């Protein structure tokens, strides 16, 4: 719901699971995740390394297969069963990667990089390619004088602008942003985040922003989903998550955000215990081994349930802990 209007799901998933390996060495990277990313939303996926954020992103992009579950795109079951259908799917869903230097072809100029998806898609007439390339360069703030520059001649911020321009060239409905600012200087991070927001307001694109840094997404996200070892443990609006975190893991993440407030340091939650193995995990809460509130019933299967309006938590003791 935004401005009183019900938003349609852009990308949805039910029971989405990814298992690597076989036999007795199966690693459950993403475990029966349900989600709805609505049109025009800025949704952030946060969690530590190994939480399954990037694996989920790759499944949504069609870069790796889904072991179990269903994904719908723009209200229809996703079909990427062959190369032609996958190419058509990629016209509507694109990615902005973490390292702009590694994600750009070092032998292609700025103009060639942005022009390539326009040529391959066939959406733009040959005679209009140059004008459309100019429009996209201006849209993402790339100076005309850099048209023939190569990636190694650009700084990190400009390289990422090229990556953003390439991703948005085909006017996709959904864009996966895989830690797009983590490799940039702090001053440049703000510029890139502002650019992403401005482009979203103009185009209505849906963002899935993957990061391990909650402080980055606080002011830009509509909703935030917290992942831990392949499972969603909490999802709600950005304001609600920062004002009233309910899951013990979310509280620990928020307490780790650096602050100039000396009193904040005293509230830091230090997690103890061992991280459970994702190889053939046992039923129950994956966080139980590190949770200070864990009891026997935490080792029973958990489900992500709505504990207040639009606030979902996977914890059987959430009411007791937060009473």
What do these predicted ranges mean?
Residues 2-9, 26, 235-323:
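Short catalytic/signature loops enriched in Gly
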Residues 176, 180-184, 188-266:
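P-loop NTP-binding/switch modules centered on Walker-like glycine-rich loops
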Residues 169-173:
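A short, proline-enriched helix->beta-strand linker immediately N-terminal to the Walker B motif
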Residues 128-145, 254-255:
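Conserved ABC ATPase "signature" region
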Residues 61:
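Helix-to-loop junction immediately C-terminal to a conserved catalytic motif
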Residues 69-79:
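Conserved ABC transporter NBD signature motif
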Residues 150-154, 158:
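Conserved ABC ATPase signature
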């Amino acid at each position: 719901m935004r401005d009183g209007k019900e938003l349609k799901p852009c990308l949805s998933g039910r029971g989405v699971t990814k298992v690597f390996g076989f036999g007795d060495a199966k690693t459950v990277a993403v475990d029966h995740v349900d989600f709805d990313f609505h049109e025009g939303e800025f949704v952030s996926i946060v969690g530590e390394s190994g939480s399954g954020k990037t694996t989920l992103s790759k499944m949504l992009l069609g870069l790796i297969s889904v072991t179990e579950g269903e994904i719908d795109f723009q209200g229809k079951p996703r079909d990427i069963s062959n190369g032609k259908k996958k190419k058509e799917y990629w016209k509507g869903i694109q990615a902005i990667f973490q390292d702009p230097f590694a994600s750009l072809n070092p032998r292609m100029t700025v103009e060639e990089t942005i022009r390539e998806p326009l040529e391959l898609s066939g959406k733009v007439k040959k005679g209009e390619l140059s004008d459309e390339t100019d429009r996209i360069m201006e849209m993402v703030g790339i100076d005309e004088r850099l048209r023939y520059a190569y990636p190694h001649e650009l700084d990190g911020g400009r390289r990422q602008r090229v990556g953003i321009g390439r991703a948005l060239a085909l006017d996709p409905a959904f864009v996966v942003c895989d830690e797009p600012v983590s490799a940039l200087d702090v001053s440049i991070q703000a510029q890139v985040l502002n650019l992403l927001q401005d482009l979203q307001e103009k185009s209505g694109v849906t963002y899935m922003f993957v990061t391990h840094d909650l402080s980055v997404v606080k002011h830009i996200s509509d909703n935030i989903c917290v992942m831990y070892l392949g499972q969603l443990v909490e999802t709600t609006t950005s304001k609600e998550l920062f004002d009233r975190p309910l899951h013990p893991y979310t509280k620990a993440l928020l307490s780790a955000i650096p602050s100039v407030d000396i009193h904040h340091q005293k509230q830091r939650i230090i997690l103890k215990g061992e991280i459970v193995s994702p190889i053939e995990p046992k039923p129950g809460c994956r966080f139980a081994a590190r949770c200070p509130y864990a009891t026997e019933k935490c080792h029973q299967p958990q489900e992500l349930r709505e504990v207040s309006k639009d606030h979902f938590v996977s914890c059987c003791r959430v009411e007791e802990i937060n009473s």
